[in-house]
């Protein structure tokens, strides 16, 4: 990771880490629910999605503060999806980010409700953002696109396709389609939302959308590679968990070398789309290299 990106990440990851639990503290809801919500929000993580939004805003020379609430709302939705993914009925994982998963601490019922609460509260947070208070059309766009990215035609639909793809060998295209929705749609939204807040042109929005799709794909390819040859201590979960869940992965379909070649191809395509956008691309280019080269 280059020094500029590292500095940006460190500064704003700390800000996001501190800000996320602050939204929950004053909610008029049972303490157990607040504790369960906060537990997973404070479990750490790369914060790639909120940082993508903030890096996009920065590239258009817009104030970072304008996007902080939205960035945190996206992370709440991502966190809800992880809580539910870890449940016994889904991936049945006991650890996440090096800690016991939510249902191991609070029980399955409370974990489900904590996820539900994070999902629904995120939309309340977006509609009360100062940055869109005087622009209802922009708020509507942001909410509609987030609902689409995280709902039945996006992340949830991708999760269903992933479950239905277990215990059978998928084609590479089927796997790409699953991860386009399961992982890529929310990543793409993070970038597009930053551009919408920055009043980007339709041409720039389209190039950023294509960049984001490629970035989401290479993010998942890298995840699959790390599941084969990563360090479980750095990953915060057991290596080889996908094999244990009988899931098709890029290495299982293409071999490890084939998956790495595919990673290189989509990294190049992502950069080509980004180069067409009229903005300061420094951070997003560096972030692309980071996603492709990360070790966790």
Task: Annotate the PLM regions.
Residues 1-18:
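N-terminal leader/targeting segments and the immediately adjacent pre-domain N-terminus
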Residues 12-14, 21-24, 28-274, 279-292:
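Mg2+-dependent prenyl diphosphate-binding active-site environment of isoprenoid biosynthetic enzymes
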């Amino acid at each position: 990771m280059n020094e500029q990106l590292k500095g940006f990440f460190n500064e704003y990851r700390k800000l996001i880490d501190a800000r996320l639990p602050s939204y929950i503290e004053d909610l008029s809801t049972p303490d157990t629910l607040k504790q369960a919500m906060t537990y997973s929000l404070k479990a750490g993580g790369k914060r790639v999605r909120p940082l993508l939004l903030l890096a996009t805003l920065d590239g258009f020379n817009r104030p970072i503060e304008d996007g902080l609430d939205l960035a945190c709302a996206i992370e709440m939705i991502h966190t809800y999806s992880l809580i539910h993914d870890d449940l016994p009925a889904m991936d049945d994982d006991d650890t996440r980010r090096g800690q016991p998963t939510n249902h191991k601490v609070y029980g399955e019922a409370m974990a489900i409700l904590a996820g539900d609460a994070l999902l629904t509260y995120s939309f309340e947070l977006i509609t009360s953002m100062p940055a869109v208070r005087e622009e209802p059309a922009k708020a509507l766009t942001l909410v509609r696109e987030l609902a689409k990215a995280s709902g039945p035609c996006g992340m949830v639909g991708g999760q269903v396709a992933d479950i239905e793809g277990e215990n059978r060998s998928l084609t590479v295209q089927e796997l790409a389609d699953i991860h386009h929705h399961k992982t890529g749609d929310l990543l793409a939204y993070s970038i597009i939302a930053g551009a919408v807040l920055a009043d980007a042109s339709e041409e720039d929005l389209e190039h950023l959308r294509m960049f984001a799709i490629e970035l989401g794909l290479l993010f998942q390819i890298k995840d699959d590679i790390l599941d084969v040859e990563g360090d479980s201590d750095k990953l915060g979960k057991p290596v080889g968990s996908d094999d244990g869940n009988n899931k098709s992965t890029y290495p299982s379909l293409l071999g490890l070398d084939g998956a790495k070649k595919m990673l290189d191809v989509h990294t190049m395509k992502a950069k080509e789309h980004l180069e067409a956008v009229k903005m300061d691309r420094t951070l997003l280019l560096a972030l692309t290299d980071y996603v492709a080269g990360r070790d966790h």
